[in-house]
Structures are given as structure tokens and as C-alpha cells.
């Protein structure tokens, strides 16, 4: 019976005149949604279309030359990078971090051992 009463109360509340404004608001927002989406798409494509327009003025040879230059610059940067030194530095950093963390863990276990057992016992 309670279930039926709840269904009837919900049905009456859904058709209540006080909720017509909510339904009207939902209906209006659903009608306005496609317009808002189209405006957002226009804004997004506006930015992209400006980039396309900028590239449209450049000749294919000029774009190819820019691509070649960027590839050369990337290759030069890769060649100039000292990977062995970077690997050594990374190894040192990892070792330092590991030793620091292990010291912290040892200190914590000592403190916990002292609190529990009344001190750290050597075996």
C-alpha cells in the first residue's frame, strides 16, 4: 500500500501546477541547446579557420622549407644532447632518493620499535 501511495503522490506532484515552471524551463533549455552548441562550434572553428587561412597564404615550398628547418633543429638538439651525462645524473638522483627514503623508513621503524618494545634490540 505504501508503494501505491508513493506512486500516487509522485504522480500528483509531477502534475502539480507549481512544477509547470520547472517543466517550462527544461523545455526552453532543450530548445536553446542546439543554438548554444552551434555558437560554440562556430567559435571553435573560427579559431581553427584563422589558422587555416594563415597557412593558406603560404606557398607549399615555404611550408616544406619550414618543415625541413624544424626537422634539422630537432636533429641538432638530439645530437647536442649528452645522454650519457643525463643517465648518470638520473642514476645519482635515484640513488640519493633511495638512500633518503630507506633512512626515513629505518628511523620510523626504530621509533615504532622503541615505542612498542621499549627500545631497539640488537641480535
Swiss-Prot record:
One GO term describing the cellular component: mitochondrion
Protein name (Swiss-Prot/TrEMBL): Uncharacterized protein C4F10.17
Coiled coil: none
Compositionally biased spans, kind Basic and acidic residues: 50-60, 74-100, 107-123
Region (Disordered): 34-123
Listed GO biological process terms: negative regulation of cell integrity MAPK cascade
Compartment list: Mitochondrion
The keyword Mitochondrion is assigned to this record: yes
Entry keyword annotation includes Mitochondrion: yes
Keywords, comma-separated and alphabetical: Mitochondrion
